[in-house]
């Protein structure tokens, strides 16, 4: 890129939300749900200008007449036609830019299949005619955003949770762990345990309400059994929440029972290990000489790590698993909900990064497989 004054675009496509904006900014300009909706019925009114598909917030607000689909499942793109619609919406409606004028930095899940990165590359160059692009691993960007190049990132979003050890800027694929338990599952679980209290939440509209309850009132207990004890003997942990129709509901031990599932997936009927064990197992898969650096640089990232109390609990749990004298530090940056995007913004604006872009010319010469040679 000889043209230094053109800002690169940074697009972080998550299972739940898409974050997009310009490199060099400190926060994404656009954050919208990663959903594509199609009308359930043929329009009755002629000339209503009904579109064949809606994306993001517009799809969310018209969900009564649409069938909603999430093109990204568990962090990995499964529907390319819909994904293309999301990117189109990102460039033209949210950021209002011409993608053929800006380099684009995209993010991918750890252990993303090779064919997927090639497909992303192909769509960017052939459909959107970008002058240059790059694909970066989400967890690596979160680590950059925290000002580190070595550490282990526990990234938990809406669709998937990963623990990714990174040494000197490179992810160590053999030690990456994936846990299919994240924000969406926690919302489902909260819906379930609120139903036990006698409140009924079933529809997609109600699911959004429960997600809001989760984000506003849930927290992680330092000692779960102790907290359950406290909740059963006093009402000090109870909070009330006003529903959109004005009805007020009370929520007690559900506040910490919901996020506890990330430490005890058995609550959801899953046999997987909790996030603390997963992080520990990831570290143990790494070379013995770098473990010390990973324990001392454990970085939390993603929306599902936003629960109050999560860092203290991680500290406690990992200390119990690790060797007795090991220094353990859990880093939970306040902006961790967007740290993947922020890391991308930092990376794409570094002068040393400018020769890393895959240019249109390189793509034309080598085809989509160029992505494996230039992005790792």
Swiss-Prot record:
PTM-bearing positions, type N-acetylcysteine: 2
Record's comment on post-translational modification: Oxidation of Met-45 and Met-48 by MICALs (MICAL1, MICAL2 or MICAL3) to form methionine sulfoxide promotes actin filament depolymerization. MICAL1 and MICAL2 produce the (R)-S-oxide form. The (R)-S-oxide form is reverted by MSRB1 and MSRB2, which promotes actin repolymerization.
Entry's EC annotation: 3.6.4.-
EC top class, as a word: hydrolase
N-acetylaspartate: modified positions: 3
Residues found modified as N6-methyllysine: 85
Family that this chain belongs to: Belongs to the actin family.
Protein name: Actin, cytoplasmic
């Amino acid at each position: 890129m000889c043209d230094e004054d053109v800002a690169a675009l940074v697009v972080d496509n998550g299972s739940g939300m898409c974050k997009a904006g310009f490199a060099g900014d400190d926060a994404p300009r656009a954050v919208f749900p990663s959903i594509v909706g199609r009308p359930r019925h043929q329009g009755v009114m002629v000339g209503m200008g009904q579109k064949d598909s809606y994306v993001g917030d517009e799809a969310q607000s018209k969900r009564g007449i649409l069938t909603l689909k999430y093109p990204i499942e568990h962090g990995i793109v499964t529907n390319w036609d819909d994904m293309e619609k999301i990117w189109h919406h990102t460039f033209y409606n949210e950021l209002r830019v011409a993608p053929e004028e800006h380099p684009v930095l995209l993010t991918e899940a750890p252990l993303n299949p090779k064919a997927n990165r090639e497909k992303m590359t192909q769509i960017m160059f052939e459909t959107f005619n970008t002058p240059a692009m790059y694909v970066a691993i989400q967890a690596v960007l979160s680590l950059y955003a925290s000002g580190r190049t070595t550490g282990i990132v526990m990234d938990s979003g809406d669709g998937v949770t990963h623990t990714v050890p990174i040494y000197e800027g490179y992810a160590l694929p053999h030690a990456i762990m994936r846990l299919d338990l994240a924000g969406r599952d926690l919302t489902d679980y909260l819906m379930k345990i609120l139903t036990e209290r006698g409140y009924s939440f079933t529809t997609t509209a109600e699911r959004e309400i429960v997600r809001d309850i989760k984000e506003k009132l849930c927290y992680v207990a330092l000692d779960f059994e102790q907290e359950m004890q406290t909740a059963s003997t006093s009402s000090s942990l109870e909070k009330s929440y006003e529903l959109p129709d004005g009805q007020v509901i009370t929520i007690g031990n559900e506040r910490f029972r919901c996020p506890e599932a990330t430490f005890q997936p058995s609550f959801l009927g899953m046999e997987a290990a909790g996030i603390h064990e997963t992080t520990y197992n990831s570290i143990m898969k790494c070379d013995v000489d770098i473990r010390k650096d990973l324990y001392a640089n454990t970085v939390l990232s993603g929306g599902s790590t936003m629960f109050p109390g999560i860092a203290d609990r991680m500290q406690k749990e990992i200390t119990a698993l690790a060797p007795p004298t090991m220094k353990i530090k859990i880093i939970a940056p306040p902006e961790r909900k967007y740290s993947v995007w922020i890391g991308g913004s930092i990376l794409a604006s570094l002068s040393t990064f400018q020769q890393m872009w895959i240019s249109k010319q390189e793509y034309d010469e080598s085809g989509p497989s160029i992505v494996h040679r230039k992005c790792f």
